Structure formats: C-alpha cells, structure tokens
Amino acid sequence: MGLEVGSLCFKLKDGGLTSRTNSFKRDDTNRHQNSPKSTMERSLSFNSWEVPKETKTDSDFEVLETKKSTPNTLNGRNCERIQIKKPTVTPPEPFVFFSPRPVTELDAAATTLQKVYKSYRTRRNLADCAVVVEELWWRTLEGAALDLSSVSFFGEEKHETAVSKWARARKRAAKVGKGLSKDEKAQKLALQHWLEAIDPRHRYGHNLHFYYDVWSASKSTQPFFYWLDIGDGKDVNLEKHPRSVLQKQCIRYLGPMEREAYEVIVEDGRLMYKQGMTLINSTEEAKSIFVLSTTRNLYVGIKKKGLFQHSSFLSGGATTAAGRLVARDGILEAIWPYSGHYLPTEDNFKEFISFLEEHNVDLTNVKRCSVNEEYSSFKSTADEEEERKEVSEEVEIPSEKEERARPVFDPVKRLSCKWTSGYGPRIGCVRDYPMELQAQALEQVSLSPRVSPANSYGPIPSPRPSPKVRVSPRLAYMGIPSPRAVKC
C-alpha cells in the first residue's frame, strides 16, 4: 500500500502560476529523497525550510535560535524544541574610588565627620532640653500664680495673711522693676532670639519664632528643634517666612578670639578699633551697630540682616547697652539705643552715655535719638516707677519675723550672664532648674538614662499667658522668680 503525499510547488512561468502534485510510495521514499532529480522543490516540513542567503540584509538580526534535537512524535507529527536565547547583560564595572591621600587619612576624615554629626545631634537635643525645661518652668509658675490668686485665700475659714499679701504685691511690683544694681540692668535676649542662641545653627530668631508658634499650637509630643528639623514639622513651610529663608539666615556668633577684631577703644575722644588702631567711619549704605558688654567693653560692627546682628558680638550673652551709631573719622555724630535682640531700656541708654563720658567723648554735638521714625524700641520706666510706689503704699509691710518666714520668691537673684559661646551654646542653664524639671526635660528629649515608654509622653507644655508674650521671664526678668530661688 503506497502513501501518497502531495506537495505544492508554485512557479512563475510566462507570467502564469503553475502547480504540481507529486506522489510516491512508502518504499520509494528514501530513493526519492536521495535523488538529486527530486521534483519536490519545497516540502511542507519546517526542517528543510531555509532563508535564501541573498535575501538577508545587514539590518536582519537573529532573535530566536532553533536548535535541532531529537524529534518528538506527537500524533504522527514531528515536533521540535524551540529555545529562546536570553540577552546577555554586562554589568558595569565597579567604581574604584581613588584618592591621593593615604587610607589612614580617609578613615580619620570619616571619623571626624561622624563626630561632627553626633556633636550636632547632641547639641540639638540639649537645645531642645533647654526649651522643654523652660516650658515646664512656665507651667510650674502658672500653677504657683494660680494658687496665690485663688479664691481659697478669701474663704470663710482661711484668711489671707500679711505674708501672702506681701508676696503677691512683691510679685506685682517686680514685674515692672528692673533691679537696682548695674548687673541687674543687663539685658538678655528676648524669647525669639534666645531660641536663636541655643539653636546649634543659630538661625535668625525673627524667623525661628514663627515656626515656634506653629509647634506650640500643634501640641506635638516632639521637642521643638527635633520637630523642626527631622520630625513632624520638617515639611512645614510658612508662606510669609519660607523655610528657605529660615535655613539661609544664620547669625554668626563670635568666639573670644574673633570678638577682639571688633573691640573699640577711645583715644583722644575718638573711637577706633583696638586691633589696627583704625578710626571708625560709618557709611550711609551700611549700619554700624554697637554692644557694650557687662565688663564695659565696647564692640562695633556692620549690621547684616540675618547674618551679623547685635547677638553676634557676645554670642547671645547679656549686654549693658546696645544700639546704632554714626561716626566720621572716629568722631561720634549720632547714637540710637535700638536693638531688636536685646530691647534696651532707657536706663541701658544712660549707661552707655555714662561710659562715653567716662572716656572723655565730646557729646555736645552728638545726636541722641531715643525715639524716631525708624526706631522705637524704648521701654519707658517712668510709669513703672509710679506703679511700684502705688503698690508699695497699698500693701502692709510685714515685720522682720514675717519677712524671714515668707516663701522664697526672690526675683532679685539673677542667673549667670555667660551661658553661650561662639562655637555653640553651652546649655548649662538647664542646671539652674529644679532636679525634677531637669529629669522631665531630659526624658522628653531622650537624653535621660531612665527607661520609660514613649507613649507616656504628653504634648510639650507651652502655657503662654498670651500670644503677645515674647519674653521669657527667666531671661528678661519680668519678675517671675528665678529657678534657683524656688524649691519644688
């Protein structure tokens, strides 16, 4: 029985299409296949299909590669395994870091960088600790003030004693008084610029306090500087005070050696720099600012907003006087007692006048501007003195025995004026607070060795009596007792 296989062959002949059918028997299969005169021109088998070489172009490329293997029979048909060639991916050569410096120096540089970062992180935590303990102190004082003014003093069974009357009156009077000695007249930074001083970057306090207000209103459980830099407030960007300006404007704080270049002395009634003995000459374009330290040293420099200001000279320390001046060839022409950082009083201005007179500076033709169109930072003390007299006349003066027995709420005791340096604030002021508040603040910023669950932290207290209050009582001596004077 023969097997007839039909194959179709198409040829063009004289413009026509012809077809042929071939048939052969099974026993003649080998003979026909081996015959060079085989009439079958193309088989239906895929094995014999080949692309003519002349039809290949340069743009052709092989994507699939058919590899012949042992044919598998499936329902009488020959099946072949088709393998897909995977593309070869050559990985990039590893980058070899090359430095002319020896490996030991590179390791030392990496170690230094790590130390600098850890140091900054520690200083930021300490700054947060100072803010937190200050806020805790506010809350303690608010509670004490509430007790003093409570209606319980006027209950039927408990009458207010002369001691408590005197304590309340003294507290009231101290809010308007600035002390008696010259040291007590020294002005420290307002709250917004106190934040600037303890900030490791010394970002301009005018910008910083707007973000402080946002943090205070947020009731966040994170400390302020942590919240601002890497915490929940890192994406806060105020439209009127953008973060780009906040990060750009950083005040330069001078160290002890740098400060000497700005020290001014008086020779023959003229102001000149101690180093170089060059006379001071002010220009209309640049504003000359001055600071008189508590040690009676005068410093003068050019103001650059957001970069160099009154707080730069003493690294945020206390001042006896601060303001602006105009001088030509060392001869003083005008002085303004203006400083947004220190908010000097009229008494501070008088101290500066006294300093100039002691050094034989001719003030006859010097323009003294306490208040003008551009600057008006004076705090009048005349009305305050009258109020103090009225308060002292209204209250009963306690006896010597009662004076010794009254609670220790003494606002006269002052804290140290030196608590920061040009290379970064020393947050030693935290030690001025009671131990209990110190421990709470250290726990809040995760610097305490005590182990306490994180969920036990509540919002950072910020019980400001009014949003308008911009001065920390501990720093500006508004009459709230010093932490050293109260035992919790």
Curated annotation (Swiss-Prot):
GO terms for biological process: regulation of stomatal movement. Induction: By light, cadmium and lead. Down-regulated by salt stress and treatment with mannitol. Keywords: Cytoplasm, Nucleus. It is found in: Cytoplasm; Nucleus. Residues 20-46, 377-403, 448-472 are annotated as: Disordered. GO terms for molecular function: calmodulin binding. The keyword Nucleus applies. Highly expressed in leaf mesophyll cells. Expressed in roots, rosette and cauline leaves, stems, flowers and siliques. The keyword Lipid metabolism does not apply. Residues 32-46 have a biased composition (Polar residues). Involved in the modulation of stomatal movement. Promotes stomatal opening. May play a role in the regulation of chitin signaling. May be involved in biotic and abiotic stress responses. Interacts (via IQ domain) with CAM5. This is IQ domain-containing protein IQM1. It comes from Arabidopsis thaliana.
